[in-house]
């Protein structure tokens, strides 16, 4: 018996792409207009991109809505992502994609708290230990509210989600449980795949392309709680310029850090640049009263278990001085983003007290205990 097919264009299998036209096997006659609507829409988008025109924030937001609703097929999404890669993505386009992912994702409300997220873009291929995740607990131990938005490792041995799972954390998207965690230990962990539904829709295409796309830039921008503050580590200065423009338009308190030798965090292996709402400066480790460290001292381990042991050693204040100092530096600049009037020496002292007093470790233990009890 004939059954009326639904109107999800993505399910109609493309058989040939030629002369700018995409043909499908036997689409229902009464759905021809739907096909033309989306092909025309994507054709207009791709024409703008190939002509060097910049899409508006609303246009790119609408693209994400269509992708999340399954209204574009994989060929169209692939063409879009490739076009943006070749032309280069612009600030308003990043903002629009970010808006769309936030809108189509699951929100988390931590108000009235003013929370901070500490995150790196990844992709620096340095395989460092979990510096930003350690810094999150140091900042939480100092009394600030931290909402860490993270995922499994992409290019390193262990990402934030790997470390959390090692400690028995069961990820949740339940706002009440996340809020109770924030209230109990100043920390909540937001496992990215549970929230960004739009990201799931492009995952197969990104996997097939096997090259970085504009969606690689969006991870740090789509924390579902929309933090008031963010410390972001980037791997190069071009990314620093792009993200700073995005943050300025979003109106949040930010700090962006880049180690000149390519780390997407403050590595203390040499000079590093910091850009905030009010300051842009190159620092030396000595400016913080800290020694320079060797790259091999930041090694993240060969296995997730080894990475978790390094993570624990830092928060238990039994790690090497180099690892400890790197975490203190990153935590201090996160505190500086929140406390603009404090100088960096004060912020380092606050971070050091949190770590050496055991308060950072207490935050971790409380968080894990609450999670394992399912709150």
PLM regions: where:
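Positively charged N-terminal leader segments that act as targeting/secretion signals
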Residues: 4-28
């Amino acid at each position: 018996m004939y059954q009326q097919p639904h109107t999800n264009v993505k399910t109609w299998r493309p058989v040939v792409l030629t002369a700018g036209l995409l043909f499908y096997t036997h689409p229902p006659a009464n759905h021809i207009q739907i096909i033309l609507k989306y092909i025309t829409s994507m054709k207009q988008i791709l024409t703008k991109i190939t002509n060097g025109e910049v899409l508006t924030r609303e246009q790119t937001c609408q693209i994400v809505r269509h992708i999340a609703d399954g209204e574009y097929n994989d060929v169209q999404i692939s063409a879009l992502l490739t076009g943006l890669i070749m032309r280069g993505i612009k600030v308003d386009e990043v903002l629009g994609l970010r808006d769309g992912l936030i809108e189509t994702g699951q929100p988390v409300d931590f108000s009235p708290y003013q929370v901070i997220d500490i995150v790196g873009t990844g992709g620096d291929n340095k395989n460092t230990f979990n510096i930003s995740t350690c810094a999150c607990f140091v900042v939480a131990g100092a009394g600030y509210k931290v909402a860490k938005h993270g995922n499994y490792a992409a290019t390193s041995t262990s990402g934030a989600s790997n470390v959390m799972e090692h400690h028995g954390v069961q990820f949740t998207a339940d706002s009440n449980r996340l809020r109770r965690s924030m209230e109990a230990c100043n920390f909540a962990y937001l496992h990215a795949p549970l929230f960004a539904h739009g990201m799931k829709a492009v995952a197969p295409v990104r996997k097939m392309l096997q090259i970085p796309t504009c969606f690689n830039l969006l991870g740090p921008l789509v924390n579902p709680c929309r933090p008031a503050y963010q410390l972001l580590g980037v791997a190069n200065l071009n990314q620093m310029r792009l993200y700073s423009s995005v943050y300025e338009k979003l109106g949040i308190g930010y700090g962006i850090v880049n180690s000149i030798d390519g780390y997407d965090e403050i590595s203390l292996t040499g000079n590093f640049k910091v850009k905030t709402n009010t300051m842009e400066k190159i620092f030396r480790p000595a400016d913080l009263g800290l020694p320079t460290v060797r790259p091999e001292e930041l090694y993240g381990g060969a296995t997730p278990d080894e990475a978790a042991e390094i993570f624990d050693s830092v928060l238990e204040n039994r790690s090497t001085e180099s690892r400890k100092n790197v975490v203190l530096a990153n935590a201090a600049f996160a505190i500086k983003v929140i406390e603009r009037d404090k100088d960096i020496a004060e912020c380092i002292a606050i971070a050091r007290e949190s770590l050496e007093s055991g308060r950072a470790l207490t935050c971790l233990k409380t968080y894990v205990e609450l999670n394992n009890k399912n709150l």
